[in-house]
């Protein structure tokens, strides 16, 4: 039986922190599914299709070096239902600090009640990426700052193009 992990998020944009979690999951699992949550009441910077393309492009080299399959998909609703539909046994989450731990433990407990057969595993963020959030990256980029230290190169290029002001 292969071990399949589901990693959910908005990934708007994909950050080096997300890449850290995906890389850790790739070491342990046979397949990692990156599931982009779609919330019709929010207006993301990148469209769902753009995020899929960026994740596939950024993660391609990582998965080429591991014996692990990557897939990217959209989902709406509960993460445990998305995991069940995808055949994933694991939900993977990253932890940057204590506030992440508090929130993620509550979510893991709720998910465990709803889906006892699906486990949640946590990866502590590497110190180099602990401070990165997609919200802050969007703010830096939309205010004309250089977001490249916080995102994969393909995402930095897309951010620069998306947020460039017309001359």
Swiss-Prot record:
One Gene Ontology molecular-function label: ATP binding
Ligand binding (substrate): 10, 42, 79, 93
Record-linked Gene3D superfamilies: HUPs (3.40.50.620)
Alphabetical UniProt keywords: ATP-binding, Coenzyme A biosynthesis, Cytoplasm, Magnesium, Nucleotide-binding, Nucleotidyltransferase, Transferase
GO biological process, one term: coenzyme A biosynthetic process
Site residues by UniProt (Transition state stabilizer): 18
Main localization of the protein described in the UniProt heading: cytoplasm
Protein name: Phosphopantetheine adenylyltransferase
Catalytic activity annotation: (R)-4'-phosphopantetheine + ATP + H(+) = 3'-dephospho-CoA + diphosphate
Its job: Reversibly transfers an adenylyl group from ATP to 4'-phosphopantetheine, yielding dephospho-CoA (dPCoA) and pyrophosphate.
Cofactor: Mg(2+)
Family: Belongs to the bacterial CoaD family.
Protein residues bound to ATP: 10-11, 18, 94-96, 104, 129-135
Assembly: Homohexamer.
Top-tier EC class: transferase
Cross-referenced SUPFAM superfamilies: Nucleotidylyl transferase (SSF52374)
InterPro entries found in the cross-reference section: Cyt_trans-like (IPR004821), PPAT (IPR001980), Rossmann-like_a/b/a_fold (IPR014729)
EC number, as in UniProt: 2.7.7.3
Pathway membership, UniProt: Cofactor biosynthesis; coenzyme A biosynthesis; CoA from (R)-pantothenate: step 4/5
Compartments (UniProt record): Cytoplasm
